[in-house]
Amino acid sequence: MIRITLPDNSQREYAGPVSVADVAQSIGPGLAKMTVAGKVDGRLVDASDVIDHDARLQIITPWDQEGVEIIRHSCAHLVGHAVKQLYPTAKMVIGPVIEEGFYYDIAYERPFTPEDLAAIEQRMKELIAQDYDVVKKMTPRDEVIQVFRERGEEYKLRLVEDMPDEKAMGLYYHQEYVDMCRGPHVPNTRFLKVFKLTRVSGAYWRGDARNEQLQRIYGTAWADKKDLEAYVKRIEEAEKRDHRRLGRELDLFHIDEHSPGTVFWHPKGWTIWQGVEQYMRQVYRDNGYQEVKGPQILDKHLWEKTGHWDKYRENMFTTESEKHDYALKPMNCPGHILIFNQGVKSYRDLPLRYGEFGQCHRNEPTGGLHGIMRVRAFTQDDGHIFCTEDQIQQECINFTALLQKVYKDFGFTDIIYKVATRPEKRIGSEESWDKAENALIESLKASGCDYQIAVGDGAFYGPKLEYTLRDAIGRHWQCGTIQVDPSMPERLGAEYVGEDGQRHRPIVLHRAIVGSLERFIGILIEQHAGALPVWLAPVQVAVLNITGAQDDYCREIAAKLQKALPNQGLRVELDLRNEKITYKIREHSLQKLPYILVVGDKEKAAGAVAVRARGNRDLGVMPLEAFISLIGQDIADKV
């Protein structure tokens, strides 16, 4: 007898081995029809898999998250089925599930076009309508090789070579099409009706730009049509907010083929960049950080000491001079430790906080570059706190409070807190890990933060806190971090004299709030859909005349605004063009300016201005001093 225990702890007995689908059928035909897969003793299996021992079983349906992911994975296989029917010479590579979707990498002699994508999607719908069963066959290794050799699927053969210890592999058959996978997959194509192919992009075999280029077809799939429609709306909203498009439309920056992965900042974009940097510089000053500046290029021997030369060299830009090897720094921490090492440091100097707007270079693959979000040259608000083990908790409390204020000023209040704990492979004693992890956890508790434990996600040398922003359309952006590091101070010989008169190693806390300024500005642009807060907007107010009769008064207004606020003038654009006022208002509105001041004869006679706020809000006519007070309050309130 086989005893099956269900999630409600009820039990069912069967005379012999029984499949997941059979168990579902014995419970009821409705459940059987909705069964995507099963979870046996916590392990996902196909609906056709047989249970031959007493076990706990959960029936997986499309309404379970695992069910949705299985649907997505099976949709990737369906892409393969459709592609091979339409383009028989295409070679299939891999088709995994990703967040909210899936993709399939394909080798083909020409790029797929939007018309190809539409044809593939249509063929997938036709295949789904055939309502065929997806058949799983566990197949001996030699037969798997034979199957793919006969079909000319060279990439599948390479993947088989990557698994020398596998004696048998799962082959999933979609009619004449076959794919290799660990599974599980849906039992029938009727589960795949709610899907959409979204785009095609380039990719590389094994993600390495030195390998052959592939094409990646992306798609999404859901259990319910409403979920798909909501997803499509989110994607459409994300496209409207795409920082690359807004960067062009608002004349902020561009990326040029002459320097891939680096940003050409235009005047308005550079104004935003300077605004973020100056704000963060004031944060340094107000919170006990000493700003430092390290060199861009450092000798190979330093990178050998830190371990980067062996483990990170492929991602570093290197050069040679006078028979010495150098590298552009991919991070700022070694330079800060070299600064710390100059002169004798005492326990009285700790915690010692260094901050730098350090430009770093990382040789990211071309295919991974993305606007100003993923670049090769970037500037970090990089800080390093040299402290003792006992000071970690308080420094983390201080850092979390500071980070929350900074994010709020930039328009983010929804933060996810994670503690990344010790990985399997690590250095240091268990006691030191216990103390460090406990300090991080207690710091979040003291800060009143709910947090998640990311088990095993810490670095090999220490745990860290990760701070992830949730933006206006629900996307997650991991920006802030504070990382405990007892290793690099030891590698580079950092010491301080303790209260006992002996030399000790400091702990280094690597910390960043915005991280890469380039990436953070990209996030800001998308968060605010280009309509940046008044204090950050590259142009805060435009002054528009109706006719030439108001030109001198408009110039007078602009001059006053540019000197209006203590220690800072407003960023003003004066538009005296001989164009219709409606045309000028529309043009400046499209540039997402916070305020537009319109001046006609009545306003000139009254010494006033007609104020239009962003979002086509008419605030009426007011004295110039009243407007200065209004915009000054906006800037002070960071809105």
Curated annotation (Swiss-Prot):
GO terms for molecular function: ATP binding; metal ion binding; threonine-tRNA ligase activity; tRNA binding. Residues 242-533 are annotated as: Catalytic. It is an enzyme of class 6 (ligase). Its main location: cytoplasm. One of its GO terms (cellular component) is cytosol. Zn(2+) binds at C333, H384, H510. The keyword Nucleotide-binding applies. GO terms for biological process: threonyl-tRNA aminoacylation. Its EC number is 6.1.1.3. Its cofactor is Zn(2+). It comes from the Bacteria. It is found in: Cytoplasm. Binds 1 zinc ion per subunit. It catalyses: tRNA(Thr) + L-threonine + ATP = L-threonyl-tRNA(Thr) + AMP + diphosphate + H(+). Keywords: Aminoacyl-tRNA synthetase, ATP-binding, Cytoplasm, Ligase, Metal-binding, Nucleotide-binding, Protein biosynthesis, RNA-binding, tRNA-binding, Zinc. Residues 1-61 form the TGS domain. Catalyzes the attachment of threonine to tRNA(Thr) in a two-step reaction: L-threonine is first activated by ATP to form Thr-AMP and then transferred to the acceptor end of tRNA(Thr). Also edits incorrectly charged L-seryl-tRNA(Thr). Homodimer. HAMAP family: Thr_tRNA_synth. Belongs to the class-II aminoacyl-tRNA synthetase family. This is Threonine--tRNA ligase. It comes from Paracidovorax citrulli (strain AAC00-1).
